[in-house]
Amino acid sequence: MEKSPDTFALYRIVGNDLYPRHKKGQTCENLKFILEHEPELENCEKKWIVNRIIDKEEELAIITQLHHHEQPFIHIPFHEEAYKVIEWDMNCLPDPGYLVSKEFENLDSEVRIRFIAAMYQLKNNYVMNTNGARNKALRDGRSRVKWILPWDGNCFVTRAAWKQIHIDVTASPHLKYFTVPMTRVVNNKQLLADEFTPRPVEEPQLIFRDDSIEEFYEKFCYGRRSKVELFWRLAIPGEWDCWKDDPWDQPRRPKSSEAGQFGAAGWTARLFSGMKKLEQDNKASFKQRGLARLEGIISTLRHVDVMIAGKSADSNTLSMYREDVLKGEERNYRSGKHLPHIDQLIADAKEAITRAPYSVTDKKSLPPSDNIHDYWHPAPYWWPNPNTKDGLPYIRRDGKRVPGTHIYEKKSDKYDRSRLQRVFDDSIILAMAWKFTGDKTYAKHGARILERFFIHPDSRMSPHLIYAQVRMGRNRNEGSGTGIIEMKDLYYYLDAIRLLKSAGVIKEDSFTKFKDWLSTYLTWLVQSPQGKKERMAVNNHGTYYDLQVASIADFLDNHPLLFETFIRAQSRIALQFAVDGSQPEELKRATSAHYCCFNFQGWVNMAEIASKWGIQLWSYRAPNGASLIKGAKWLLSYAGKEWPHKQIEEFDVERFLPIWFAVPQHLIKLPKSAKFPKSKYTVKPRFFPHDGVRPYWNLGLSRRDYH
C-alpha cells in the first residue's frame, strides 16, 4: 500500500444555506469562487456532492455552474415524500413529561436551543445529510484513488496549501488518516494574494487512505459534532476532548482499532460565510457560530415543514372545518337537498341575530382589579372556607360548582364566562349560516360581535385572563393558570373570523386590530405566570393550552411557535395516556367520564390543526407505546356499556360519537358494544359547551360516514 501511487480525490459537499449562520445564496457564491479561482491540484481529481438542496432554484443554479465548468458530481436529491414521514425524535426526552416540566422551563436559552435541535435530529439527518454525504464520497473514492478527501463545500485549496498537503501525506504513507486544519477568511479574495498567510487553527478536515476502515457515524447530525465524533474514535486530540455531553446527546462510540494512526497535513481555507461577526478567531465568536448554526438548522427544518404543508395550508385556511366538504354541503343545500342540521343552523343563526353584540363591560360585578375591561370569573370549584371568619382562603370542592360559574345559568351574568361562550358560538354559527345561504345579514352581525368584544376601545376585552378562575384569598386574588381553559374554544372562533373575512364584512383596519389583540394575548399566554403554569399541566388543561397556542400561532403565521407547540403536544401523548389507552389523570376526577371525553375531544381538535400542517398525530406512537389510537379504542370500548369509574353527575353518552367520527376510519374498528349511527349527519350537531365539542362539528367534517 505504501508503494502504490499517491492519487487523490477531493470531494466537496455542497449543501443548504442556513440562515442566520450563512448569508442566503452564500453556497452559490462560494462555489462560483472555487470554480473560477482554485488551481488544478497535482495528482488530484475533483468531484462534488450536491447534497439534498431544498430550494429547487438554488439546486439548479449549483448544477448549472458545475456543468458549465465541466465538473463531475454526485447528486443526492431532496424528496418531499421521504421527509414527510420523518418524525421528531421523542427518544431524546429524558422522560415523557420533560417538555412540560419545571426543569425544561428553567433551561437557559443556549441549552434550550441545543435541546430543540436534538428533537429535530432525525429530520436534520435527512435534510443536511452531512455524514451521509461524506460517506458517499468515501465509498465512491475508495474504489478509484489512494487518498480520499470528503470535505465541506466551502473548503478552498490554494496552490501553496496543496503543495504542503501533498508533501506531508506522501512523507508518511504508512498512516491511514490525516487531519488538515482550517483557516478562516472574511474576504475570499484574500486567498488570491501570493502573500496570504494562513492561521490554520480551526476544526480540521480529514483525509482517508483507501484501506482505512472507519467512516463517519451517520447518527451524529450536523451541528452536533458530526465530524468530531470520528475524531474521538480515532483519538485525534483537540479542544473537543473537553466538551461535555447533554443528557439527550447520542452516546459516544468506543475507540477505533485504528485509533492513533493519523498525522497532520498542510492546511486548507474555509471560505466566507457571509456573516463577518461570526468569523472571528476567538472563543466568543466560536460560541456564537455554534448557536447560529443550531438556530439555522432549526429555522431551515421549520421552513421545510411549512414549505411542504404550505402547498395545501396557510393562515387563511380553515383549521377545523374542511373547506372542500363545506363546499359540497353548500352545493347540496343550495340545490334543495336540505340537511336537517343546516336548517337547524339557520334557525340558530336567526336567534343569534336577536342577541346584541357582547362585551366584558356588560358584567354585573367587577374583577379584583376594578377594571371592567378585564375578563372576570371565579374558580368554579372553590368555595369560602368554613373554618375562617372571612372565608379566606377559599377551599376546593371537586365536582361542586359555585353559583354563576355554570354557563348560561342564573347569576352567570355577574361574570364573563357565559358571555365569552356566546361570542364563540354565535360567531361560528353566523359565519356558517352565511356560508350556506350567502346572506350577509348573518355575517354582518358576526362582524359586529368582533367589533364590540375585541376592537372598540369602550367595550373591548383586555388581552389577558389574569382574573379567570380567581381563588379568593390566594395568589393576590389573581386567577390561576387553570383559568386559561375558559378561552379553550378560541380555535373555532378563529375559523369564524376566517369565514367572516372571506364574506367581506370585516374592515381591514379591524382585522389588523384583532390580530394585534391576538398577538398581545399570545405573548401573555406564553410568558405570564398563569401561562407557564398551564403549559406545565399534565392533564386536560395542558391539552387545551396547546390547542389555544397552536390555533393562534396558525392564525398569525407564527410558524416557529406553531411547530414548537406541535412538538410539545406530541410529547404529551406519552404523559397523558397509559399503554392501554386509559387517561390516568382524568380518571382521578369525580366526573371521570366527562373529563376523559373532554380531554380526548381536545386531542381531536389538536390533531385536526396539526394535520393541516402535515403533522399526523393520529399515527404517532410514543416510545412507551402510548398513542391517540389506543386512547380512542380504550375510550370507545365503553360505548354501550356502563362507565366503571367515578362519575357523580349524569353523563351524555352521545359524546362518544364526535370522537368516533373524528378518528381516521382506517385506524380503528367499531366496538361490538357500540350501536353507533352510520352517518354523522344523524347525530345531534350541538353539545353543551363544557363538553368541548365545537358547534355543528358534523358539518365540514372530513371523515366519511361509516359503512
Please annotate each region the language model reported:
Residues 26-44, 65-69:
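Short, acidic, metal-binding catalytic loop of nucleotide-sugar glycosyltransferases
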